[in-house]
Amino acid sequence: MAPNLRKSHPLLKMINNSLIDLPTPSNISAWWNFGSLLGICLMTQILTGLLLAMHYTADTTLAFSSVAHTCRNVQYGWLIRNLHANGASFFFICIYLHIGRGFYYGSYLYKETWNTGIILLLTLMATAFVGYVLPWGQMSFWGATVITNLFSAIPYIGQTLVEWAWGGFSVDNPTLTRFFALHFLLPFAIAGLTLIHLTFLHESGSNNPLGIVSNCDKIPFHPYFTLKDILGFTLMFLPLTSLALFSPNLLGDPENFTPANPLVTPPHIKPEWYFLFAYAILRSIPNKLGGVLALAASVLVLFLSPFLHKAKQRTMTFRPLSQLLFWILVTNLFILTWVGSQPVEHPFIIIGQLASITYFTILLILFPIIGTLENKMLNF
């Protein structure tokens, strides 16, 4: 009998073990769809980005008009650009839901998978930031100026670091050129990190909603989960294409329709919606260095999740107190996002400060306490 090529060929064997014959827990819910959705988001972004790069000019005098040219004169250029811009939003929606699922179901106990995931998040944030600068509109320019300027808060080397990043004494042509180079490069770094992320995941196997070992009840990935993933793709592409076709500028800033002008500061500088929660935490501290540290901590705190898990049960499925705390945290993140979009004035300042304190208190103090308390309740 001839050997099955799918199982014997060196390359196909790897694909087979990762996507076809992979033993998968039979009870994983739709919350486990976001990994594959992130994969399809990445592929879509790389494809649309490549097509946009063919028509883009990384020069301060031409960048804005080259984007306008793409939208007006290139065949379906408007659609490619709208899909790329809104695809970034969907990428972040998926990654936040993916992290939320990992947090709720205790997936962070697979430490290597979790840590590579956080590195992926940081790389994605860097990619989105440098990408937002490329159209060279007002918010692009001032966003780049404000965020890169934060590095000057680093003692001793800060100012040198900022000027090195800018390639001069202000955000100018060298900055735009290097940001374009980075924006082109980083998605491929994300693709490479994704393979590492998957390698670590397949080392342990997927977690499941019950958080128990599922070796006794596994089914092949194909056809069951390939079909489920295709349904997920459809359900994601539907709102993405609807947004790109009917309301492409809904999530953007009107300020970015004005070409960058270093002499005119926009009344309210703010990043894209997916960074607003971190921006609100940054603004809630009146000290520059303190704000930068809080901003970094808002994401890096995720690295501590495996060490702050005190509960005997892995998931929150049967832990109502932790569930309540989790949803308070989610609500708190929505409040931070809203505050980040508001001007720096009363009452938004105090709301932002309270929400920032609540964010860190829940993650660092309340979750371990509630976990320990629930352990005690198990003994009654």
UniProtKB/Swiss-Prot annotation:
Q: What is its main location?
A: mitochondrion
Membrane topology note? Multi-pass membrane protein
SUPFAM superfamilies for this protein: a domain/subunit of cytochrome bc1 complex (Ubiquinol-cytochrome c reductase) (SSF81648), Transmembrane di-heme cytochromes (SSF81342)
Q: Where does heme b b562 bind?
A: H84, H183
Gene Ontology annotations of biological process type: mitochondrial electron transport, ubiquinol to cytochrome c
The UniProt record gives the binding positions of a ubiquinone as H202
Q: Which InterPro entries match?
A: Cyt_b/b6_C (IPR005798), Cyt_b/b6_C_sf (IPR036150), Cyt_b/b6_N (IPR005797), Cytb/b6-like_sf (IPR027387), Cytochrome_b (IPR030689), Cytochrome_b_C_euk/bac (IPR048260), Cytochrome_b_N_euk/bac (IPR048259), Di-haem_cyt_TM (IPR016174)
Annotated keywords: Electron transport, Heme, Iron, Membrane, Metal-binding, Mitochondrion, Mitochondrion inner membrane, Respiratory chain, Transmembrane, Transmembrane helix, Transport, Ubiquinone
Question: What GO molecular-function term can you cite, just one?
Answer: ubiquinol-cytochrome-c reductase activity
Q: Which cofactor does it need?
A: heme b
Query: What protein family does this chain belong to?
Result: Belongs to the cytochrome b family.
What is this protein's function per UniProt? Component of the ubiquinol-cytochrome c reductase complex (complex III or cytochrome b-c1 complex) that is part of the mitochondrial respiratory chain. The b-c1 complex mediates electron transfer from ubiquinol to cytochrome c. Contributes to the generation of a proton gradient across the mitochondrial membrane that is then used for ATP synthesis.
Q: Beyond the main fields, what else does the record say?
A: Heme 1 (or BL or b562) is low-potential and absorbs at about 562 nm, and heme 2 (or BH or b566) is high-potential and absorbs at about 566 nm.
**Can you name this protein?**
Cytochrome b
Q: Species name for this entry?
A: Fulmarus glacialoides (Southern fulmar)
Lineage of origin: Eukaryota, Metazoa, Chordata, Craniata, Vertebrata
What's the gene? Answer: MT-CYB
